[in-house]
Amino acid sequence: MLPLLLLPLLWGGSLQEKPVYELQVQKSVTVQEGLCVLVPCSFSYPWRSWYSSPPLYVYWFRDGEIPYYAEVVATNNPDRRVKPETQGRFRLLGDVQKKNCSLSIGDARMEDTGSYFFRVERGRDVKYSYQQNKLNLEVTALIEKPDIHFLEPLESGRPTRLSCSLPGSCEAGPPLTFSWTGNALSPLDPETTRSSELTLTPRPEDHGTNLTCQVKRQGAQVTTERTVQLNVSYAPQNLAISIFFRNGTGTALRILSNGMSVPIQEGQSLFLACTVDSNPPASLSWFREGKALNPSQTSMSGTLELPNIGAREGGEFTCRVQHPLGSQHLSFILSVQRSSSSCICVTEKQQGSWPLVLTLIRGALMGAGFLLTYGLTWIYYTRCGGPQQSRAERPG
């Protein structure tokens, strides 16, 4: 009697443990053409442990197809035919024994767009298609761009490794073909630019130029590319000083070497412009005879103003360049010369005393003339006795 009483309890326990047909999968999945996507999936089905253990087979089918006759898009059953167009691209991932039906779709194609359903088979008792939970796949045009990776900033003369990758791509399907283009790559072997990685030794002239990585999937008309602008750090170069006259029409002189002497007329006004090519921009400062000039005289752009230069304002002028990758300086001698009119000109104070000097000279000359006339007259009368003495000495 006891076994008969326990039988309903055992049946009740078995019924409670009996699973049902359930499928958990995304209803809608979108992937770009040429890329891949992983669709997580899990399932359950009724199965009793005292049954025999035939192999468990799972299948993914195109919607609308008859499971008994149609080719599958993915399965773990080696005896079932797989559609040629999905062979190797649609794959089951995970352990189906652990109820994992995840589907990997690689190298997605436009014709893959559509609905798919999952089916499970085990022996004669389990043959079920989960038609109530279908996967809707949409393949859109490729808009994803490659990623270009490298350590910034690039430094002139220092080799740097660059890599290009396409987000969303996977190993399934034909391999990717990479190609690099850009002015900075001209000295490289053309075969090097066919790899996803390359080593670049940038030059100063490469700063601001474009570098492009193009990715194409072999056998498919799917191409995408990304272009980046190179930021190359380089030490100061082409240091020069240009001299401008305030009332001039252009550059009066361009100094490219140290120690050059530049003559200039006293009273002229100049602008001195110090220029240098570097990245990042260098810090410029002006010195006269080794001493830093007042910041109010200079500007951030390296321009120095010298208004109405005096005779004592010449000397050695130096432009110094400070940069993380190196420093430079350039000097010249400013020789101030008196103008030709300064030899015959006097100051305003001196010009005011000229009338008095002329008056004194004029008075002195008049006095000297008077004294000379008086002296000659006195000598004449003294020696000759005058007119009366001359008449007395005449004979009767």
Curated annotation (Swiss-Prot):
Residues 146-229, 236-331 form the Ig-like C2-type domain. Residues 19-136 form the Ig-like V-type domain. GO terms for cellular component: ficolin-1-rich granule membrane; plasma membrane; tertiary granule membrane. Residues 17-358 are extracellular. One of its GO terms (biological process) is cell adhesion. Interacts with TYROBP. This is Sialic acid-binding Ig-like lectin 14. It comes from Homo sapiens.
